């Protein structure tokens, strides 16, 4: 384990300690000042990579997998609360802390895996955004993918106005996605009794291989490696007394509540996706729900909805997909900066860092489009591959997080409680096993 240098550059230095609040403010006002970072984290739990598994799960198996979404969301809340404590208690992000734990060659391996995970995450956003542009404006996929490169410059422009503006934009886009799916689920008239029953565990989830496979897909796509790096850094954007136990404890409390609130919203969105799939397609034409284009066309031609409402719902679906892709663009590029600076102590101009990350994600998408001549199903298959790689990369983020947050020398009084350690190690073992199983099954079906 390396020696921690407290004089090294702060995590995301341009936003670190930039959001102030007055000590004389009431507790409720201080809490409001801490609302925001959880929004950026919640984006990863409802990105385009999650959409297919949730809607396919509903279309093929009704409401059965709502229980899996619930367990996945509770697990995410636990892990994200650990990253909050790590960031605030140590004033370091997960990338910096991982570097301190490992020797240089091993740290470089972990850095490469983290970078590839961010590129894999970005691939899903590029594909989701490009498909949304095609559905909404008939823009060819290759042009849509190229357009996404310029998203990074939009982020750079917004950053000039402060981190709060980014949080506000992300919050607006999340609210847009949420309202669209609330409306679509309302129109689809789901069975409320069956929805409630879906939150009860069913033995078929394990006994039925097909259900288990989709369940593993939901779990594997829920907890994203880049979110762990991102959250441990952006919680430090609030200006509190770094030497006061009381203020750190309060910061951890507020940031954890913020995280749980926003992840609850992500949980609702994922439930709405599954409910929509179940209400419209379960027992009707569930086998035809394979990708974004299939979902769009199925919504458009759904007999239950009618011509006008089907057109409205399919268009709203595409708008939500575009909003989700743009949201994830913001968080992915920030996570890329955190990983590079944290692992390598390398700081390059923000525009270059973000342009390189996005370009590396766009290249495989463009190659896929050129080689397969714009084949839509191949694009969606590439998205699935990107999610599989995220499953492989996950333990390389979870294990350093658990080791660091259970270390009393690093965390002091903020170290993990015994029950947290038990739950965290249990989650790591179960998630790693399930992800390995998912990878094997994915390659079997190729």
UniProtKB/Swiss-Prot annotation:
GO terms for biological process: iron ion transmembrane transport. InterPro entries: NRAMP_fam. It is a multi-pass membrane protein. The chain crosses the membrane at residues 32-52, 59-79, 107-127, 139-159, 168-188, 205-225, 264-284, 303-323, 355-375, 381-401, 420-440. One of its GO terms (cellular component) is plasma membrane. Disulfide bonds: none annotated. It holds the Pfam family Nramp. GO terms for molecular function: cadmium ion transmembrane transporter activity; manganese ion transmembrane transporter activity; metal ion binding; symporter activity. Keywords: Cell membrane, Ion transport, Membrane, Symport, Transmembrane, Transmembrane helix, Transport. It is found in: Cell membrane. Belongs to the NRAMP family. H(+)-stimulated, divalent metal cation uptake system. This is Divalent metal cation transporter MntH. The lineage of its organism: Bacteria, Bacillati, Bacillota, Bacilli, Bacillales.
């Amino acid at each position: 384990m390396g020696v921690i240098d407290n004089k090294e550059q702060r995590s995301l230095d341009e936003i670190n300690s930039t959001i102030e609040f007055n000590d004389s403010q009431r507790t409720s006002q201080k809490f409001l000042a801490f609302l925001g970072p959880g929004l950026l984290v919640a984006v990863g739990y409802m990105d385009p990579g999650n959409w297919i598994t949730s809607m396919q799960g509903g279309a093929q198996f009704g409401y059965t997998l709502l229980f899996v979404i619930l367990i996945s969301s509770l697990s995410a809340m636990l892990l994200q609360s650990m990253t909050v404590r790590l960031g605030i208690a140590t004033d370091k992000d997960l990338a910096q802390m991982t570097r301190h734990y490992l020797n240089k060659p091993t740290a470089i391996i972990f850095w490469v895996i983290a970078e590839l995970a961010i590129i894999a995450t970005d691939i899903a956003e590029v594909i989701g955004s490009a498909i949304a542009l095609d559905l909404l404006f008939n823009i060819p996929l290759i042009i849509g993918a190229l357009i996404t490169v310029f998203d990074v410059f939009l982020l750079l422009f917004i950053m000039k106005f402060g981190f709060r503006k980014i949080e506000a934009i992300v919050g607006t886009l999340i609210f847009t996605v949420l309202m669209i799916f609330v409306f679509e689920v309302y129109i689809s008239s789901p069975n409320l009794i069956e929805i409630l029953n879906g939150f009860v565990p069913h033995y078929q989830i394990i006994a039925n291989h097909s259900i288990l496979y989709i369940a593993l897909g939901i779990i594997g796509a829920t907890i994203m490696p880049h979110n762990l790096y991102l959250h441990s850094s952006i919680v430090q954007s609030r200006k509190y007394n770094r030497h006061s136990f009381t203020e750190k404890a309060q910061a951890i409390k507020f940031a954890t509540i913020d995280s749980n609130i926003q992840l609850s919203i992500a949980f609702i969105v994922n439930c709405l996706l599954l409910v929509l799939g179940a209400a419209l397609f379960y027992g009707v034409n569930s086998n035809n729900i394979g990708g974004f284009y299939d979902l769009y066309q199925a919504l458009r031609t759904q007999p239950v909805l009618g011509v006008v409402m089907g057109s409205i719902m399919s268009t709203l679906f595409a708008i939500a997909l575009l909003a989700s892709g743009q949201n994830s663009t913001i968080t992915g590029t920030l996570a890329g900066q955190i990983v590079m600076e944290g692992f390598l102590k390398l700081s390059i101009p923000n525009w270059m860092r973000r342009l390189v990350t996005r370009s590396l994600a766009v290249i495989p998408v463009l190659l896929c489009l050129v080689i397969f001549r714009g084949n839509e199903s191949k694009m969606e298959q590439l998205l699935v591959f990107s999610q599989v790689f995220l499953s492989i990369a996950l333990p390389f983020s979870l294990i350093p997080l658990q080791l660091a947050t259970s270390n009393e020398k690093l965390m002091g009084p903020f170290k993990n409680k015994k029950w947290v350690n038990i739950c965290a190690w249990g989650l790591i073992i179960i998630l790693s096993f399930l992800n390995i199983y998912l990878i094997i099954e994915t390659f079997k079906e190729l």
